[in-house]
Amino acid sequence: MEMLKKAILKALEDKYNAQISEADATLKIYLEQSVGIGEHPQHIDEVDKLIEKIATAEEKLEVLKGYDD
């Protein structure tokens, strides 16, 4: 049972870290290479959504730590 718990927690940790990496990479494109995304009038809204994704995933990682014995 302990191995299953660890496997689930590790899978969730990997998932949240991947979400952070994906949002961070996209955010860097918006902030550093905006020519790469073409005409897009809602840059601020999109950047805000990406920051929200990062914050949510980071918060989930913190909660996850409480279940790692």
Question: What kind of region is each of these model predictions?
Answer:
Residues 2-69:
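Extended, charge-rich alpha-helical interface modules
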